[in-house]
Amino acid sequence: MTEELCRQLREWAEAYHQADFITNDPVQFPHRYVRQEDIEIIGLLTAVLSFGNRRMILRKVDELDALMGHAPLQYVLSRRWENDFSRENQRSFYRMVSYAAFRTYFEKLYAVYAENRTLEDALLAFQGNPMQKLCAFLGVSDRSPQKKLNMFLRWMIRRDSAVDFGIWRRMSPADLIIPLD
């Protein structure tokens, strides 16, 4: 890595790894919570919806948070999502994601928290690095950049930032990647 690139990366890190960055970023949603399970749930769902216009993302995740009664774990375990996200509902929930398609995230999260205390606990049963574990859990390819999922992993694993949580202690920040396009 060149000196110039190192300098630029440090500059960006200093600019974006500040608490005031949280206010207008999707990471604001998991920052509303203190319980690990709530942070994991809203964090994953926020990351999955983090594509397109930032204002639209913030509006949709705020709507989702309200729908969950600002209690993600309780919402998942209560199975209220079965009514809110019907298998038959092909209408758009957010951009090209239908209600039926988004339901699969709730199904997976329910399975996790019905059997495990945390999502981190569930992921440790899978082989590979954190991205491979998360992709295996979600049933998606780990061969594409998966920028949204890498962002989620960064939030959960990195410990040296006002933005990230560092609540997953059994996975190493050294195993995180930064996808570039």
Language-model regions: role of each:
Residues 1-181:
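HhH-family (HhH-GPD) DNA N-glycosylase catalytic core used in base-excision repair
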